[in-house]
Amino acid sequence: MGKIRKLDEQLSNLIAAGEVVERPASVVKELVENSIDANSTSIEIHLEEAGLSKIRIIDNGDGIAEEDCIVAFERHATSKIKDENDLFRIRTLGFRGEALPSIASVSELELVTSTGDAPGTHLIIKGGEIIKQEKTASRKGTDITVQNLFFNTPARLKYMKTIHTELGNITDIVYRIAMSHPEVSLKLFHNTKKLLHTSGNGDVRQVLAAIYSIQVAKKLIPIEAESLDFTIRGYVTLPEVTRASRNYMSTIVNGRYVRNYVLMKAIQQGYHTLLPVGRYPIGFLSIEMDPMLVDVNVHPAKLEVRFSKEQELLQFIEQTLQDAFKKVQLIPDAGVTTKKKTKDESVQEQFHFEHTKPKEPSMPNIVLPTGMDEAQEEESAEKPSVAPQLWQQPKQEWQPPQSLVREEESWQSTSKPLIEEKAAHNEQEWDHHEEEFELEELDELQNIEEIEMNGNDLPPLYPIGQMHGTYIFAQNDKGLYMIDQHAAQERINYEYFRDKVGQVTQEVQELLVPYRIDLSLNEFLRVEEQLEELKKVGLFLEQFGHQSFIVRSHPIWFPKGKETEIIDEMMQQVVKLKKVDIKKLREEAAIMMSCKASIKANQYLTNDQIFALLEELRTTSNPYTCPHGRPIIIHHSTYELEKMFKRVM
């Protein structure tokens, strides 16, 4: 007898379940997506013990006809595609025909369904075997219950995490589905406790408010753009609202939530230097494209996709976000702590978005100082023409107490987040769900006006003083502004150096002692392949031995003391990417030089020097954050100040 044999259907389903049904969240995802494909407008999700004990999905969709009920639980049985051409034009969330048989093979499943024009069907399946099938009275739609998940695969059950972790995975996937389909009303219950309720009115901003809180919804910027191949819609938060994880960014492709690192990276690139290092925005982007441009048949879980025009899409996303930020005033407002409001007061105020039209400044015209000398060289870094004598003046004799001095190196984090999510993610406790949004509150979001769109210009600022040799105070008719002088000049210097090193030239700096690069054989061969490309960006390598190169000269724009670091970075790019990203290298060099050349904390300036600094800041393309993403300016509105002093109540 031969050794190779065909596996029976039951064992095949168990093997397939290993890919499709990894945990309770996988079951919820597959069943809810089936409900959406069935044109449901209302879906209820009931969980017990984070789905390990029981998962019940109730929808008002098209239902399943009696003759299709048994077939639906056979492998690769589906109503969503008919031939191979349909595989490349997929518009539905499901299409593989694997989910239902995989789920049924590792659980006790009960199905009640009806198309509305005939008696319903009641079906019970245990471990893939049909136990009972009968007609029953049922409303239109489907009610499917999955109990004792993984009862017959104890090895899989052993690897399940805690209740909180599994519940976190489920809520995360439900949140993403709610964002991708705001036209569907979703209710999520755990042990009879309601965790989420979306209205299903099609307003994704209401869904985001229900998930992340009203406060976050107030800080969202609408994103919308269209090209020949792509349409992008969504919301992203202002740069002042960030998180420590990428998990708060959601990308939707043709109505399907996907996990795609390059899309996340494109969103980050759209923010560019607006985000601090290691911080990420809260965002939701829905991308529509011809199904021929995206391959969703990559993995049974259908969370991964491939794009045929990936680079064009990434550039389009980056440019769309950058254009959106140019239309928005990005100076963060300082929060004001006030007395706790009554419930009625807070309900009235939490749905009011500030919207003020820009007014002409009422301050008198002030003649700024002119005729300043050219900047002097500080070490190897040439200074931009920003009131150069500011940065060379000796420090004053008086110094503030040491406890008040804040060295630049000590500021390693952005300001405290303005809000905390009501809807927790995996690592948070589920007590956050206790105070839930009522539907009436969410409906009021429809009338909320958009975030103030004043353009990307910094308003005129009139300095009134300096604190601790670090912060500049200025005012205009909108209130009080605090400016970090180091961050301000760092932004000015960065844009100067970025433009200075922006063009590829043949000017090179000869090295007194050649720099030797030792590589593995594989790395050596890859670099050797790209020698001509390296010459185009001004780096000339000579072979030195079997697996080494030497560098005798480098481009003149390399910052002093960082030459070997940039050369090593170029080698790593060639080895990993098989190309040199000169734009990224020059940007990093500009950041290095700008930080080194800028004034530090605890350096006192004259009024003329402060005026010059603020005027130069106004000429930059982004006067709101330093190249590392830290804020330059914080705003206290006149109204906030009056509230602090109880002039208004």
Curated annotation (Swiss-Prot):
Residues 388-402 have a biased composition (Low complexity). Residues 339-414 are annotated as: Disordered. InterPro entries: DNA_mismatch_repair_CS (IPR014762), DNA_mismatch_repair_MutL (IPR020667), DNA_mismatch_S5_2-like (IPR013507), HATPase_C_sf (IPR036890), MutL/Mlh/PMS (IPR002099), MutL/Mlh/Pms-like (IPR038973), MutL_C (IPR014790), MutL_C_dimsub (IPR042120). SMART domains: DNA_mis_repair, MutL_C. GO terms for molecular function: ATP binding; ATP hydrolysis activity; ATP-dependent DNA damage sensor activity; mismatched DNA binding. Coiled coil: none annotated. Residues 342-360 have a biased composition (Basic and acidic residues). GO terms for cellular component: mismatch repair complex. Pfam families: DNA_mis_repair, HATPase_c_3, MutL_C. GO terms for biological process: mismatch repair. Keywords: DNA damage, DNA repair. SUPFAM superfamilies: ATPase domain of HSP90 chaperone/DNA topoisomerase II/histidine kinase, DNA mismatch repair protein MutL, Ribosomal protein S5 domain 2-like. PANTHER family: DNA MISMATCH REPAIR PROTEIN MLH, PMS, MUTL (PTHR10073), DNA MISMATCH REPAIR PROTEIN MLH1 (PTHR10073:SF12). This protein is involved in the repair of mismatches in DNA. It is required for dam-dependent methyl-directed DNA mismatch repair. May act as a 'molecular matchmaker', a protein that promotes the formation of a stable complex between two or more DNA-binding proteins in an ATP-dependent manner without itself being part of a final effector complex. NCBIfam families: mutl (TIGR00585), PRK00095.1-3 (NF000950). Belongs to the DNA mismatch repair MutL/HexB family. This is DNA mismatch repair protein MutL. The lineage of its organism: Bacteria, Bacillati, Bacillota, Bacilli, Bacillales. The gene is mutL.
